[in-house]
């Protein structure tokens, strides 16, 4: 029987992976946090904090640091992957030789596969097979607030109901971290990926000084785009009204803790994409997801005008003013 005291291994020592590891550890699970950089892991072990990505949050005593992947995976049945989407396929290749029949895989990576636009579940099943219980963790949770223990809520979608309920019980905390179960893995994955694209648009709008009305319109029409794409792929429309859909979208579009929103703000103020990303200094998932989301929408025959215009700006040289003109000048239509 899996309990909150059962060990878990988190793969990925960035800000979000560290925050989740802290959350598990505080909730009673012996937690092993793996990172690919031995120097970084050694530094965290000494300082008992992730000074590089999540400074001033001290690790719980039962949070263990590990730079050896094989050893990290030996400790636990449940393996939680928290790496950028562009590194997701690579980490699957690395863990494959160390997987055992009892392992269960969860990921909190938000994005689509680079160059294909495929859902990460598809990538997992292609590379590792379909024999493992799978789950995705997604929702409106900034790493810093999560690590500080501030109230948060998130969605857990799994391909096995028993797995979902067991995993929910080990992370759900009555003191302020709520976990909602959902069986719609497609919808939960899409919500987490495409919201980053819309957040860039909201940032661009605010950077250009368009105000709260325009931002709210982008959020509202953005959830409509995400829902249309989700329906075309068999997702449940209700998913997009939940934590991993509207919840994550609103958070990412309205708070400057969001890298994607800050990236958009800089674009709206006239910086180019390369300079904006350098200023942020961490991965901007929405930059890469924009291209994949646009190409996925084209393949599915789904109209996604906000996504299309952001794609035109990031990859085809269109400027912010012309993007705004294109969106505002669209033909009248029903809601």
From Swiss-Prot:
EC code(s) of this entry: 1.1.1.94
Highest taxon listed in the record's lineage: Bacteria
Q: Name any one Pfam family assigned in the record.
A: NAD_Gly3P_dh_C
Keywords from the named record: Cytoplasm, Lipid biosynthesis, Lipid metabolism, NAD, NADP, Nucleotide-binding, Oxidoreductase, Phospholipid biosynthesis, Phospholipid metabolism
* Residues the record lists as binding sn-glycerol 3-phosphate: 110, 139, 141, 195, 248, 258-260
Extract one GO BP annotation from the record.
Answer: glycerol-3-phosphate catabolic process
Membrane spanning residue stretches: none
Which pathway does it serve? Membrane lipid metabolism; glycerophospholipid metabolism
Q: Name the protein family.
A: Belongs to the NAD-dependent glycerol-3-phosphate dehydrogenase family.
What is the documented function of this protein?
Answer: Catalyzes the reduction of the glycolytic intermediate dihydroxyacetone phosphate (DHAP) to sn-glycerol 3-phosphate (G3P), the key precursor for phospholipid synthesis.
Q: What is this protein identified as?
A: Glycerol-3-phosphate dehydrogenase [NAD(P)+]
